[in-house]
Design a protein with these regions (language model features):
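Positively charged, solvent-exposed patches that mediate nucleic-acid binding
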Residues: 1-99
């Protein structure tokens, strides 16, 4: 997906997205070992998933989304993470009308 998708960069996240052939959108969250130990990576992934849930109903169908965490996300609070996700989704144009 990284080869065929488009990327958008933010200081704490990278979004790679592309259209899929199915009827549903899918999302994945990636936190590499560069983020920290397992506890830190899991904490980051939980925060990302929590924020993504707020916007998921508004994501148009047929998108594949991958959110890659950057090292700066460890110091970010939940509000900054949610703001970053919203910014990336809007810039990618994958958000539809609010439901």
């Amino acid at each position: 997906m990284k080869d065929v998708g488009k990327s958008i960069y933010h200081p704490i996240l990278v979004l790679v997205y592309t259209r899929n052939e199915g009827f549903q959108s899918r999302a994945a969250v990636v936190a590499s070992k560069a983020i920290g130990n397992a506890v830190t990576r899991n904490k980051v992934k939980r925060r990302l998933k929590s924020c993504l849930d707020q916007f998921w109903q508004n994501v148009d169908q047929q998108w594949d989304l991958i959110f890659y965490s950057r090292a700066a996300i460890v110091d970010a609070n939940i509000t900054e993470i949610c703001s970053a996700i919203e910014h990336l989704l809007l810039e990618a144009g994958v958000l539809g009308e609010k439901k």
